[in-house]
Amino acid sequence: DADIVFTRNQFEAFKKVVKRELPDTMELVEPGSFHGGKAFYDFTPRIIYKKSRMHPDSDKMDYYDGKLNHLWVDLFILDKLPKGKAAAEITRFLHKAIYGLAMGHRHDLDYSKYSLMHKIFVGGLATAGKLIPLKAIFAMQKAIALKDRHSKGDLRYYSNYQPDYLYVTLHKDWCEGVIDAPFEDTTLMIPKGWDPVLKEIYGNYMQLPPEEQRIPTHSSLQIQVYDE
């Protein structure tokens, strides 16, 4: 699995050129574009590889216009957190609440992974969210992400990540500078503070999990890649 992370300014610049730079086999999929702007999956843009297939056809795949049935790379956005721990927590809570509202526009909701309290929270927000146009929910999410763009604070967060990763907090110096790093047969740009970033997200990332947990979570035995 590979992801790309941008600062807000970088992402806005990227969007201006991406359509003309991508080959015909790839496409930028905006999160507000599914089902005529009426279907929610998440708040994450992604680049899909159109000559691939990951799942059999289904109502769920059709609901998302078949766009989620391809290999993709997630595009995450770093935004500024407000100064002060309490203000930062309020920002994260607002994102979680907006995400809950948007869940009312998903194809289906799986409550099995939630505790009773979270089932009530998610179910209530999703029910309320059905009454709000999805376009308005996306506007609220972006407004929250941008509300602290003039903050003097040094902390950043992934504003379009799923709620259980909103805790990830990065220092400005870790992620606003980049270095070139060798990776297999190529060279990639990575955050200057790559080590503290990895530790913030994964903890001791050099230690393997127990053998029974060494199972990929982002893979499928059904992946097909087409030559033509």
Spans of features found by a protein language model:
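Conserved catalytic core of two-metal-ion nucleotidyltransferases
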Residues: R8, E12, V18-P82, M103-S112, ...
